[in-house]
Amino acid sequence: MAKESHVAAATRVGALPMYLDNPAGVTALWLHLAARLRARGLGPIADTPLWPQDYLAHWRDPALLFTQACGYPLVTALVHQVRVVGAFHYSVPGCDGAMCRSQVVVRATDPARALADFRGRRVAYNSTESQSGYNSLRALVAPLVRDGVFFDSHLQAGSHQRSVIAVRDGQADIASIDCVSLAGLRKHVPAVTRGIRVLCESDPYPGLPLITSASTDDATLATLRGVVADAVNDPDLAALWQDLFISGFEPLDEAAYRSCSAMQDGALALNYSAL
């Protein structure tokens, strides 16, 4: 007679780690989603969200059930390594449904009025792997380059907040900021954004992808999409969604993020590989 298996199912983990200015709201959202996912038969699921320091390791975790990623790594480092659940809609300037535009910010006192005026100036960005902070700005600047160069120097700040501070304090002249991040900074830490203004916006691209492990099966993927859609439409959670700027959810797949690849390819075709 076959022996009964006592191997426990691995605990699935989740996070919403990309917008860090409202951790209480993010934690509350995860608790609601985790409870609904357990009620649909998924589990065991971690009681609290992760706050990863190594994003690539987190996104590649085989125990990953649900998290946010960035569109640029999705089409580069994460190809065939995750599955896309969809994207939230955000009710902030620069967002339209699941699509968004980066906000290019400069000091309010800077007399420049066009992107071309920043030739030879200093740019700040959060990471070279960022769609909003790097890839979209590179695509926007690419038609203006001469011999593969536009900016005189650059500063890798490490986060959108630090990029904004660098511009505000004169350590850099211009930066491209995720529109939801900028709205969150203005709401939760307004002192950071005083003294800056939006110069222009990038071309549109899909917002942060909600992803799951590549090993997640089709049935579980459908459950994830259904649970998130139901939660977004739950009037009892309206205050939470408003606090997080979330106004909807749209199922998407990897193909929706081809525009991120197109931005990279377009810049490279114009001999512009690095800001």
Question: What do the predicted segments below correspond to?
Answer:
Residues 12-36, 97-163, 238-239, 243-247, ...:
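Bilobed "Venus flytrap"/periplasmic-binding protein-like clamshell domains
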